[in-house]
A protein has these predicted regions:
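Glycine-rich phosphate-binding loops that contact phosphosugars or nucleotide phosphates
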Residues: 289-423, 427-437, 471, 518-560, ...
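Conserved short alpha-helical segments that host acidic/polar catalytic motifs at enzyme active sites
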Residues: 1-246, 250, 262-269, 273-292, ...
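Structural motif
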Residues: 67, 95, 293-295, 341, ...
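Glycine-rich, anion-gripping cofactor-binding loops and their flanking helix/strand elements
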Residues: 180-202, 206, 327-361, 500-534, ...
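Active-site phosphate/pyrophosphate-binding segments
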Residues: 260-264, 268-295, 385-514, 586-603
């Protein structure tokens, strides 16, 4: 959600911060700001509502410095206004603070310590910076004032603090919100996402909860809140700087849709040997074989990927598998089996709801596996085991390639687990061949983009409502296709189990109501067709997407060959492209839909 950048050292701070903020745009934001200091008595604070370009246009050549902090804000406390934008400044204009997270006791702190202080914003962050300043006025150093403030606040935070009286130092603190230190040559950077600072360095230190960091141009000192020094390892982030660029594509989403065939091939290459045998860490395989039940915990698109993965684990590995929404599981944990293993799916690896569950079940002693696209993420670091999606940066808010990568990796893990346990179903399932079919089939569908654009225009050009139906994994992909359409086109789209239409939803069918029917499950294809005919009889405009061996001449889209259990790897390409073109035709920003953030780092 909110994004933080900071720099101190021999760099042009204004340009470093602006470029970093631009690379954080994909996370979602409604305002932005920066503070820069030249360490020679000149500093500047600029904040604006709107896009980064609005902030950039507000700067002139006088806004320069060798250290500073920047922020993109996603409103959680207070409306999107200039006053509520970060950085926040203390009334004595000594301290400047940026913050990602939520301080849950801000009101209590204000009442207890700041009754005589006039606040100019509605944010929890201003309470923190004013509290630091109030403590400093008692004679405490900036660092000690920050330490004492951290001992008082409750909630989640990633802080970057500048003391105007000591601009050669930058203070950083973290609790339950991601924050990285980037190591440079006579400079250091701070960021909530390595992607924002990859043009500066590829060496990053992932901070842990309770870390307090003092940065200068040449030093990084990490302590716990009680002053105990700690050492955190530095990791090299292997990523081509150009991977985060759109290249020839008008939008990141279209680029990422087109990258999915390559992602399928990359996953096979990463997790299999020359003989086509799946290679997973031995410790992970031992853990998985202890499971009497798997619990997949996820949110949003990742939850939908889990719904596709669950039957793969049950059919190939013979392990009962449940899929849970993280936001529900965190507060309403079901009765667990005797030997559960938890699998967490998250594109960003920073989803707050999922981390809450991870911390909870680890405290209960249960083994955990994170599957994510970001190797430096909190979920990757804190789980017992970690597998990377290797999908490359996903910048568009609407997830595409991470979804299909999650399904593909679930298939690889399910096959490996089933094979290790001698399951005949696993032996009969050639997952490498199926993922090769997925890659070629995805490419075929991508090349039919014009057909899908025309279909999207016919179905969704003026509609306010749309329905996607299917059974089994087709129901799972219906949920995801509906989510894609509603996310970026603002159409009230819903995915339903086709058999449930008659239990209420069919009452919503009117003349020309668009209904997309997925028909890839041989066990239920006839029933889904019957449901499609039923809504057509009531005036619905039906678009049928059918498996190659189940297709009829009047089906509008026939899929390339693939095992039915992996059909979502193909059907969702149609759903993604139709959503993309609907948003495009309606004139919306495909990559940055309203009210949505790419990385949901607060509950």
């Amino acid at each position: 959600m909110c994004g933080i950048v900071g720099v101190i050292g021999n760099q042009d701070a204004t340009q470093v911060l602006l470029r970093g903020l631009e690379r954080l745009e994909y996370r979602g934001y409604d305002s932005a700001g920066l503070y820069v200091n030249d360490q020679q008595g000149h500093d500047h604070l600029i904040k604006r509502v709107g896009r980064i370009r609005v902030l950039s246009e507000a700067l002139d050549e006088t806004v320069s410095g060798t250290m500073g902090i920047g922020h993109t804000r996603w409103a959680t406390n207070g409306r999107p206004t200039t006053a509520n934008a970060h950085p926040h400044v203390s009334n004595d204009e000594r301290f400047f603070l940026v913050h990602n997270g939520v301080i849950t006791n801000a009101a209590a702190l204000r009442d207890a310590y700041l009754q005589d202080v006039d606040l100019v914003s509605d944010t929890d962050t201003e309470v923190v910076v004013q509290l630091i300043a109030a403590l400093a006025r008692t004679g405490l150093t900036a660092k000690v004032a920050l330490q004492q403030t951290l001992g008082l606040v409750e909630g989640s935070y990633a802080f970057a603090l500048v003391d105007r009286l000591d601009p050669a130092t930058l203070y950083v603190a973290k609790n339950q919100s991601p924050l990285l230190i980037g190591l440079g040559d006579h400079f250091n950077v701070v960021t909530s996402d390595a992607l924002a600072m990859l043009d500066q360095t590829d060496r990053f230190v992932a901070l842990q909860d309770g870390d307090l960091v003092t940065l200068t141009a040449d030093t990084v000192t990490i302590e716990q809140l009680d002053g105990t020094p700690v050492v955190r390892p530095a990791h090299t982030v292997v990523l081509n700087d150009g991977d985060a660029e759109k290249g020839p594509y008008p939008y990141y989403m279209l680029k990422e849709i087109n990258e999915q065939p390559a992602v399928m091939r990359r996953l096979v290459a990463r997790y299999t040997d020359a003989a086509g045998q799946i290679q997973l860490p031995a410790a992970l395989m031992r853990t998985l074989q202890t499971a009497d039940r798997l619990y997949i915990v996820a949110a949003g698109t990742s939850y939908h990927a889990g719904l596709v993965g669950a039957p793969l684990f049950e059919q190939l590995a013979g392990v009962p598998t449940e899929v849970h929404l993280a936001s529900e599981f965190g507060y309403h944990q079901p009765l667990l089996s005797a030997h559960p293993v938890f699998i967490f799916l998250s594109q960003s690896g920073e989803t707050a709801d999922i981390r809450q569950v991870l911390v909870k079940v680890k405290a209960q002693g249960h083994p955990t596996l994170t599957i994510t696209n970001v190797e430096t993420s909190t979920l990757a670091r804190e789980a017992d085991h970690f597998l990377t999606l290797a999908a490359g940066p996903e910048i568009a808010v609407a997830s595409t390639k991470a979804y299909t990568a999650q399904i593909a990796l679930e298939a690889l893990v399910a096959k490996a687990l089933g094979a290790a346990q001698g399951r005949a179903a696993a032996a009969d399932f050639d997952v490498v061949h199926q993922l090769s079919l997925a890659a070629s089939g995805q490419q075929t569908l991508i090349e039919e983009a014009d057909v899908l654009h025309a279909a999207a225009r016919d179905l969704f050009a003026t509609t306010r409502n749309a329905f996607f139906i299917g059974r089994g994994v087709d129901h799972a992909v219906s949920l995801e296709a509906a989510l894609k359409l509603k996310e970026i086109s603002y159409v009230q789209a819903e995915g339903f189990a086709a058999g449930e239409l008659k239990h209420g939803t069919i009452a919503l069918i009117e003349q020309e109501t668009p209904v997309v029917a997925f028909i890839t499950d041989p066990l239920t294809a006839a029933h889904t067709r019957s449901n499609a005919e039923e809504v057509a009889a009531r005036g619905a405009k039906v678009f049928r997407i059918a498996a190659h061996d189940l297709a009829r001449p009047d089906d509008q889209l026939q899929l390339p060959p693939i095992d039915a259990r992996l059909s979502p790897l193909l059907t969702i390409i149609a759903g993604q492209l139709m959503a993309y073109y609907t948003s495009l035709d309606r004139g919306y920003d495909v990559d940055r839909p309203r009210n949505l953030a790419k990385s949901v780092t607060v509950e």
